[in-house]
Amino acid sequence: MDVAAPETAQNLLAQCGHFSIRMAETPQEIRLAQQLRHRVFGGELHHLPDGNGLDQDEFDGQFRHLLVREERSGKTVGTYRIQSGADAGDGRGFYSESEYRIAGLEKIRRELWEVGRSCVDPEFRSGAVIALLWAGIAALQKKEAFRYLMGCVSIPGSLTREAWQFYRYLKRHGGVSDLLCGVARSGFECPDRESLPQEDLLPQEVMTPLLKGYLRAGAKIAGEPVLDRAFGTVDFLILLDFGAMTDRYRRHFTGDK
């Protein structure tokens, strides 16, 4: 699916068919992201924040918010938030550090950006919307020239045994980062660590589209699985090194020829 660079509008990052991705510039636009997150997380993850119809936290103010819009209706159908290492240093830190103690961060902080709160309207989970979320990140990476992308990727909270099996499989097969090492903070420990099958198999249940996309792009798992009880998810810390990305996926990710 072809994603085109925009011709106009400074905050417009890319276009694909009748969808576009842009950077939120106003509090009202950020509310659109928070409303979508509330609706999707509340409906699918049974995570219901306070009753104002918004999913918001203390980190939202320091993040930049990507919005995918369906142009015919004007509806916001996808969102992702992203912050630089400098943003994190000036604010409350990295969101991922609320779940993990992460060794190695300071060595790469200046080259590191963090993403999170990926969310797509269930009626619009097409290739176009997902491609535009990737294109938005790629446009920022090209502009800001950061090397590393870090974030938490979620799978259903019932898959604790499968999460540990997945982590063990990647560790045996070179899929775990040697740059960062995340360990669960108190209250985020993932159970079932010891009750693992002996087979060296990759459990397909954990391979959500987002996680699969990161792994295909060359990302590595940067920490053991954690259990986010508030959201009812198991989370993996991922680290994507743009400097180590293959030419094929660099072209796919950035749109470069």
Language-model segments: which ranges?
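C-terminal "cap" of GNAT-fold acetyltransferases
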Residues: 232-245
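Short amphipathic alpha-helix that is part of the acyltransferase structural core
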Residues: 9-77, 81-84
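Acyl-donor-binding surface of acyltransferase catalytic domains
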Residues: 1-6, 49
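Short loop segments at secondary-structure junctions
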Residues: 71-73, 123-124, 242-245
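Long, contiguous binding/interaction regions
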Residues: 246-253
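Acyl-donor binding region in acyl/amide transferases
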Residues: 85-220, 225-233
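Short, cationic low-complexity segments
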Residues: 256-257
